[in-house]
């Protein structure tokens, strides 16, 4: 079992896709990368905590390779925009990868190099050591599964799910 902590904009988006991915056993929305010891959604959204919205994606490598998890990450958000994803603007929405081991750091750096060719502009994804992972409030866990009709889900998340189905259908559950 391996766990990657990834930030690619609003955590609801990555959560929605990874929840449907074969071999993924857990997706937990949370916050990391900042200085506030007790972050919550409102403090993180204020931009004063330094934290990013992230997901901790746990997966079985014998079912899905780490490289596929990371390539999906780069396909599902724009890693070339600093501190924003579409209409979501602020440091909490930065493209980020948080590692616990040197092996993970190397995997992340290789994924950036591998995926750079897909983008016209330089990838600005932050690669940092994971300080502390703070689990987000219950309201944010499995958000898409609980609220698929909500406007944000319809306008922002559904196109990401469609993209995942188009390019990664072999890795998604039916």
Curated annotation (Swiss-Prot):
PANTHER family hit by this protein: PEPTIDE METHIONINE SULFOXIDE REDUCTASE, PEPTIDE METHIONINE SULFOXIDE REDUCTASE MSRA 2
Reactions it catalyzes: L-methionyl-[protein] + [thioredoxin]-disulfide + H2O = L-methionyl-(S)-S-oxide-[protein] + [thioredoxin]-dithiol; [thioredoxin]-disulfide + L-methionine + H2O = L-methionine (S)-S-oxide + [thioredoxin]-dithiol
Family matches, as InterPro entries: Met_Sox_Rdtase_MsrA_dom, Met_Sox_Rdtase_MsrA_sf
Protein name in UniProt: Peptide methionine sulfoxide reductase MsrA
Active site: 10
Keywords from the UniProt entry: Oxidoreductase
Domain of life: Bacteria
Species in which this protein is naturally found: Arthrobacter sp. (strain FB24)
Molecular function GO labels: L-methionine:thioredoxin-disulfide S-oxidoreductase activity; peptide-methionine (S)-S-oxide reductase activity
Organism phylogeny: Bacteria, Bacillati, Actinomycetota, Actinomycetes, Micrococcales
Enzyme class, spelled out: oxidoreductase
């Amino acid at each position: 079992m391996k766990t990657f902590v990834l930030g690619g904009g609003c955590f609801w988006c990555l959560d929605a896709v990874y929840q449907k991915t074969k071999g993924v056993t857990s997706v937990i929305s949370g916050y990391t990368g900042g200085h506030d010891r007790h972050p919550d959604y409102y403090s993180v959204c204020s931009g004063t905590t330094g934290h990013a919205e992230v997901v901790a994606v746990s997966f079985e490598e014998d079912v899905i390779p780490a490289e596929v998890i990371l390539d999906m990450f780069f396909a599902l958000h724009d890693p070339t925009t600093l501190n924003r994803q579409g209409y979501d603007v602020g440091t909490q929405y930065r493209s980020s990868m948080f590692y616990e081991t040197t092996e993970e750091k190397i995997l992340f750096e290789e994924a950036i190099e591998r995926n750079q060719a897909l983008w016209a502009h330089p990838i600005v994804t932050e690669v940092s050591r994971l300080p502390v992972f703070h689990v987000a409030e219950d309201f944010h866990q499995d958000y898409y599964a609980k609220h698929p009709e909500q406007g944000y889900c319809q306008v922002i998340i559904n196109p990401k799910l469609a993209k995942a189905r188009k390019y990664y259908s072999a890795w998604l559950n039916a």
